[in-house]
Amino acid sequence: MAWKTEVNEVSDDIIDGLWSDDPPLQLESVTKIRRITSQRDISCVIRSGVVPRLVQLLKNQVFPKLQYEVAWALTNIAVDNPGVVVNNNAVPVLIQLIASPKDYVREQAIWTLSNVAGHSIHYRDFVLNSGVLMPLLRLLYKDTTLRIATWALRNLCRGKPHPAFDQVKPALPALEILLHSHDEDVLKNACMALCHLSEGSEDGIQSVIEAGFVPKLVQILQLPSPVVLVPALLTIGAMTAGNHQQTQCVINSGALPIISNMLTRNHENKIKKCACWVISNITAGTKEQIQSVIDANLIPILVNLAQDTDFYMKKEAVWAISNMALNGSHDQIKYMAEQSCIKQLCDILVYSDERTTILKCLDGLENMLKAGEAEKNSEDVNPYCLLIEDAEGLEKISKLQMNKNDDIYEKAYKILVTNWFEEDDENNNNNVRCDDVDFQV
């Protein structure tokens, strides 16, 4: 039967045992404390005032079993109360235990430190500034603690504002080795650590690129495991959010054909959303990069995904399309129109609460209409106006004049006046919406 605490306070016998000079009695009392914290009765442990004594016992190098039980109790306390661990000066002692000769002590110490660092950027920076990184990195070459050490490294890299890049940059060589692991948990956490390192700045992205990670990350995209694919895509997406040269590095590594293949397979939508996000970052780039997306035959795939019943899947696909509409050449926009991209941009306009997405699509449609001026037929008709009308886009844009958001109204108004209606300066005021709608009162 599992041991359960039936008291709401730490007994005097337990406290007396902690302060005893008898190591077996100390161990017995610490084990009881650990069991109480495992039952989530952590507040009574904190109230009892035993944490300073636990930290003292943590220093007992001749009794690793005692150190292990203390570290376990502190691990549980650190989940919701990292300040208790920090304020009782446990972090420096835990960092020393990373070098313990006992695997189980090392692992439990890392777990506690990771819980502290993962709680907030304040505690993350405190643990980093306490000198945890180099001792931790040495453990990344030991199979016995590899999983938890990689998880701890991920926690040390996460959070916004990001840690100072120079402070975590020494982790790059170890992460390069970790990306060759066959352990899914190790790969997942290594990718997420790289993702966090790449999110902070273009300098961070450049360091990751120069360390040679991109080809390996692209190779990981071919693995079947969803556990690994999402972190790998997030990392590549963070890199494509950098400058054009950094985005080009991802393209040159052969990512697009693999992503194209990924989007046509029976992957869960979470993976496909991440893949579309990567594409949208690329289509926000140069015309040459947009052409790379076209050459990878991704436009028909995006059009298909934009019709998905999952709104967030639809949204990510449309975002990639709208970036292309904004940044593409006339020929590329013409190709998009031929692939029914205009309809997908129009269809998303009914989601009236999606301010950012609607504005993005309106910007894309506006730019396509500008490009359509060069494609006018003999009757001086913009062909993209006709395609928008066929997609019921004119009606949807008109209704957006009633949107409560002024930015959406103004953009819709501008598109309508420029492409469909002539503004009569004598009879219309710029503040009057050009599509009169009768409301039932």
Curated annotation (Swiss-Prot):
Q: Which Pfam families match?
A: Arm (PF00514), Arm_3 (PF16186)
**Main subcellular location:** nucleus
Compartments, record wording: Nucleus envelope
Which domain of life, per UniProt?
Eukaryota
Q: Which GO terms describe its molecular function?
A: nuclear import signal receptor activity
**Sorted alphabetically, which keywords does the UniProt record give?**
Nucleus, Protein transport, Repeat, Transport
Asked if Metal-binding is a keyword of the record, the answer is: no
Q: Check the record and name the InterPro entries matching this protein.
A: ARM-like, ARM-type_fold, Arm_3, Armadillo, HEAT_type_2, Importin_alpha
The record's section on Gene3D superfamilies has: Leucine-rich Repeat Variant
Q: Give the UniProt record's GO annotations in the biological process aspect.
A: pollen sperm cell differentiation; protein import into nucleus
Q: Cellular component GO terms, alphabetically? A: cytoplasm; nuclear envelope
Question: Where do the ARM repeat units fall?
Answer: 39-79, 80-118, 121-158, 160-199, 202-241, 244-284, 287-326, 330-370
According to its UniProt entry, the function of this protein is described as:
Binds to conventional NLS motifs and mediates nuclear protein import across the nuclear envelope.
Q: How is the subunit organization of this protein annotated in UniProt?
A: Forms a complex with importin subunit beta-1.
The UniProt similarity line reads:
Belongs to the importin alpha family.
Identify this protein by name. Answer: Importin subunit alpha-8
Gene this protein is translated from: IMPA8
